[in-house]
């Protein structure tokens, strides 16, 4: 169990580590050869060019201006200068609202921390319960635990202070959540009203198109929307299964990179000896061949395969999926279609807003809609087992990441680890580092599971993965660490007391686990966030590409991939800190300052990254905010329930029942916010759509909208390549055509002429009129 000294050692090491990271970053960002890495967003926007530094040849690589090194922390105030409105124009609403999550954490926990330290810390400190428990009940504790609720004796009237503070914390948190929800909802509506024209504003994704023996999918979609949306339908683009073609294109890109590498190597060496490669595993074994000739042949072979596969996709109706992107003449019409049921059979002609083209995850559009339910059921079961079986290794690793655990596994290290500094280092750092390393591959696993489920947009994939990551953190990182840690640390006490005393021991031990979370926050939230700004992985990849693949300035531009925020990993991390802060605020207030440092540091670091580095892959107009709000509410309810359970073990029978109202109030508040603000995030108001359409018609009366939308939702592998014969894949309707193409013999429900029959079938009214 970490002591105050251990916490101090851990804090010193993590602060020093963060400071070193900032110094290294300050040096690297000033060097001209790193400029594209640390200011990549400005290069992508065409607003920055390679810095011209004096000093001749050396000045191209090293910044020789010594005065610039004296302002190594100047980037911090610079990151805070850009106004929010300008930042939205620069980086998008998603990035700005993501930053507001950190700001929300500061607004919630700063007043809570001051109130908790002013009221609860004196109440907890001025007792001697833990001293008595240490002597008479053999319960392990340290001086730092005297600041927790565990130091208050059972049945004490002092628990009223914690109950009153729980109400105060809940009211303040709910108030800030409501204000923030209202602000973000207004920002979203204003952003949607002011943003420029985008293809997704006019387009819906139609899925589960029913099969028809007489018409192709394209003809059927065209006919259905000409009949049911005759005044508003504009064009459509059927979805095809181009996954194999995309794999071939990706393979060709990799082969071309190797060819560029060997050609560049041969040219730069000025040697008559041509580069050699081996055909075996990873080029380490097998027959030796001329590398340049080999990769030229492989690229040519793959190009032929791509051409053949492209023809198959274009001409084979089996590659056409029962889905289509349908575009309308107005945003109003698209909103009506996306938000209504199209037929009396609710399982067919399913419509939803189309994601913007860059947000589409194209491989999943080829998944049959009928298989999605089974896929999601399988992944839910897999996630259940992943979550709950992960508790065992996490508990085991954490049990070893202690002095007692190491001495048990490796007794020969006892002499070393019993030294004061080494002991403090282990107690203050090892458990947090072990947990962080244990979770390093989890985001990739969860993202793979989300992709298997078949979601069609990158934004929704990230939100789904973030949701699962949050649940995993809740069950394993929080509950698993608390329960397993308490059980291991109090094992001796568990074995030497009657069973009815065990809940009391757990109730006393849970607040003590705050010391572990303090060390974890410093490792993950202090040093980890500071390390984010270094961007070591993108930096290394850029320089490797620059050294071995870059031949032109365009190659140099493509060599840098700045990445994006990473909502699927960043948001669950933030939510873990919300959970820890709300749970431990009335129990162990000492944890709150560490959380405040995280929120403040992360806000500055990520604001800098959003301004200078990250290039967001999509823009969802803050559609993720209901998830953020819901998870903070979940954390608030968990904190209330745990406090009720904790007071129950403390025999605070007269005070504990007064907490029952808190979850009820919180759930009622959540339902109010859900009804009041959530519609702005799941539906597009028809009034807003009509206003935007009216303004656009007034400003651009001659806009060729069909030309703008015609190719917006073509699969990326058909754009910019050779032999792009995708004419059969694009709707060729003209605005004036009102004829409905069909191969059917009868069309009694079609109010427009058929190309086959030459005239429309008589309506029921006409038939009745003739009979009369």
Swiss-Prot record:
GO biological process: cellular hyperosmotic response; protein tetramerization; regulation of calcium ion import; response to osmotic stress
Stretches the record annotates as Cytoplasmic region required for homodimerization: 339-344, 686-688
Localization in the cell: Cell membrane
Consequence of changing residue 340 to A: Prevents the formation of homodimer
Molecular function (Gene Ontology), one example: monoatomic cation channel activity
Consequence of substituting residue 138 to Q: Decreases the molecular weight of OSCA1 when overexpressed in a heterologous system
Sequence segments annotated as region (Disordered): 743-772
Reported function: Acts as a hyperosmolarity-gated non-selective cation channel that permeates Ca(2+) ions. Shows the following permeability sequence: K(+) > Ba(2+) = Ca(2+) > Na(+) = Mg(2+) = Cs(+). Mechanosensitive ion channel that converts mechanical stimuli into a flow of ions: activated in response to membrane stretch and poke.
Membrane topology designation: Multi-pass membrane protein
Protein name: Hyperosmolality-gated Ca2+ permeable channel 1.1
Disulfide bonds: none
Keyword field: Calcium, Cell membrane, Glycoprotein, Ion channel, Ion transport, Membrane, Transmembrane, Transmembrane helix, Transport
Tissues showing expression: Expressed in leaves, flowers, roots and guard cells.
GO cellular component: cytosol; plasma membrane
Disruption phenotype: Impaired osmotic Ca(2+) signaling in guard cells and root cells, and attenuated water transpiration regulation and root growth in response to osmotic stress.
Record gene name: OSCA1
Stretches of the chain found on the membrane's Cytoplasmic side: 29-100, 181-372, 451-461, 539-566, 607-624, 675-772
Extracellular face residues: 1-5, 123-159, 399-424, 486-509, 588, 648-653
Organism, scientific name: Arabidopsis thaliana
Glycosylation site list: 138
